[in-house]
From Swiss-Prot:
Belongs to the ATP:guanido phosphotransferase family. This is Arginine kinase. It comes from the Eukaryota. GO terms for biological process: phosphocreatine biosynthetic process. The keyword Hydrolase does not apply. Keywords: ATP-binding, Kinase, Nucleotide-binding, Transferase. GO terms for cellular component: extracellular space. GO terms for molecular function: arginine kinase activity; ATP binding; creatine kinase activity. It is an enzyme of class 2 (transferase). The keyword Ion transport does not apply. Residues 112-350 form the Phosphagen kinase C-terminal domain.
Length: 358
């Protein structure tokens, strides 16, 4: 389907509610329809998924880092709308003093927080995103990434498992560990996210299984630090040490002034950081309006532990920072910390009141 045909399909879809539909007007499309990025990408590469899947929420992916400049007339409007900001003035990266971040374990008793996780997305600045990558390029990028993994030592040391040629036993174990990612998302597939699958894809994790990296899943890199309990300081420190090691190894990550770190989907850019806990809040969750109000006040997203649009199980919720854009990495983590502490405080109050009534 040509770029013009894709746009016609979108333009004629009266019931489509995506941000792409809202912001990719005919005037804006016509202004960029003949432009190409330095990686060879077109506006059609960016809008394809949203045109084929009219039930998309966002509907647009960047075909490569340069798309955020070449197709800024559409992408900037989508970004401002999605991230609820008036202007694109994302600050310079700042992870703070991660060796001594000013916080520790959010739940020393271990009675409420089941686990803690912080992840970031990062993109190599010298490679395009999946729609414009050849098989040779994605394999070369995987090689660059593996070379950086070899610099990991101490707690970060581990092993890389490529998806291509993975044994059934390895696949079974990684699935059991919830480490394996799949190629079954139709939005990502139509965006070109699974082109040349499974070449160039893989998973690195450390020996303790508290740090892992997804290579070329959706983004070039998804770095994830996690562990049982509420020790946010340890989780954040490990992640920051890994990012620093990779940058010191010579990797350069794609950024744009005002937007921060660039990702395949514009919904993730900025800090591209998500800090979360799985926490037991059965008493507060039973007071749905109050729970929602606290989450909104502190910019916390609450969802079921199996991801977006899933229900809570046994009063356990996934609580994370809602904002990715317009604040530093350290501020994003602090925002999650503050919100979680308030939720924890209220849960303890409600549990105490319940106990007093008995």
């Amino acid at each position: 389907m040509s770029d013009a045909d894709l746009f016609s399909k979108l333009d004629g879809a009266c019931d489509c509610k995506s941000l792409l539909k809202k912001h990719c007007t005919k005037e804006r499309f016509d202004a960029v329809k003949d432009k190409k990025t330095k990686f060879g990408g077109t506006i059609g590469d960016c809008i394809k998924s949203g045109c084929l899947n009219l039930d998309s929420g966002v509907g647009i992916y960047a075909c490569d880092p340069d798309a955020y400049t070449v197709f800024a007339n559409v992408l900037d409007e989508v970004i401002k709308d999605y991230h609820k900001v008036d202007k694109l003035d994302h600050p310079e990266p700042d992870m703070g003093n991660f060796e001594d971040p000013g916080f520790g374990d959010l739940d020393p008793s271990g009675d409420f927080i089941v686990s803690t996780r912080v992840r970031v997305g990062r993109s190599h600045d010298s490679y395009g995103f999946p729609p414009v990558l050849s098989k040779d390029q994605i394999v070369k990028m995987e090689g660059d990434t593996k070379a950086a993994f070899e610099k990991f030592s101490g707690e970060l040391a581990g092993k890389y498992y490529p998806l291509e040629g993975m044994s059934r036993e390895e696949s079974k174990q990684l699935t059991a560990d919830h480490f394996l990612f799949k190629d079954d998302d139709r939005f990502l597939r139509d965006a070109g996210g699974y082109n040349n699958w499974p070449s160039g894809r893989g998973i690195f994790f450390n020996n303790n299984k508290t740090f892992l990296v997804w290579v070329n899943e959706e983004d070039h890199l998804r770095l994830i630090s996690m562990q049982k309990g509420g020790n946010l300081a340890a989780v954040y420190r490990r992640l920051c040490q890994a990012i620093t090691t990779m940058q010191n190894s010579g990797l350069s990550f794609a950024k744009r002034e005002g937007l921060g770190y660039l990702t395949f989907c514009p919904s993730n850019l900025g800090t591209a950081l998500r800090a979360s806990v799985h926490m037991k809040v059965p008493n507060l969750a039973a007071k749905a309006d109050e729970f929602k109000a606290i989450c909104e006040k502190y910019n916390i997203q609450a969802r079921g532990i199996h991801g977006e649009h899933t229900e809570s199980e046994g009063g356990v919720y996934d609580l994370s920072n809602k904002r990715r854009l317009g604040l530093t990495e350290y501020q994003a983590v602090m925002e999650m910390k503050t919100g979680v502490e308030e939720i924890l405080k209220r849960e303890k109050e409600l549990e105490g009141a319940k106990g007093a009534k008995k």
